[in-house]
Amino acid sequence: MSRSQKNDNFIDKTFTILADLILKFLPTNINAKKAFSYYRDGMSAQSEGEYAEALANYYEALNLEEDPYDKSFILYNIGLIHASNGEYVKALDYYHKALEANNKLPQALNNIAVIYHYQAVKASEINDLETAQALFHEAAQYWKQAIKLAPSNYIEAQNWLLSTGRL
């Protein structure tokens, strides 16, 4: 039984039934349907903090999914898990892969900026000011791209860019 079929609450059960019906009648190939099922199970596991299970499902979905747009969200979610686990290099790699598949993914741009900003703050704390400035610059570049795609989002980033003279 897939994870999504084990949901307890009414909303999750309703969503699962509707998603299963859509999958059943959607005119798409079997691999795309399987990929979506793994993706959905990955999201469910991720929302419950079951990151190992989520990653296993996302990797299965990634192997089956052919559509670059859909693949970008799988890659993005893998990046989220690595970032949550403090694996920032891996997270950056997956966010960049997500952007290669779909360059209009502001949340990936934002998360890359957040990681660079975090690393810049850490570099500042140990007085590595040259590295800090380079990382702050990278963060600014990614936030500018994210804001360009989603102007009403990332207000804190916009304020930081303004207050530091980067916007």
Curated annotation (Swiss-Prot):
It holds the Pfam family TPR_1. It is a peripheral membrane protein. Belongs to the Ycf3 family. Keywords: Chloroplast, Membrane, Photosynthesis, Plastid, Repeat, Thylakoid, TPR repeat. PROSITE patterns: TPR (PS50005), TPR_REGION (PS50293). The keyword Repeat applies. TPR repeats lie at residues 35-68, 72-105, 120-153. One of its GO terms (biological process) is photosynthesis. Essential for the assembly of the photosystem I (PSI) complex. May act as a chaperone-like factor to guide the assembly of the PSI subunits. This is Photosystem I assembly protein Ycf3. One of its GO terms (cellular component) is chloroplast thylakoid membrane. InterPro entries: PSI_Ycf3_assembly, TPR-like_helical_dom_sf, TPR_rpt.
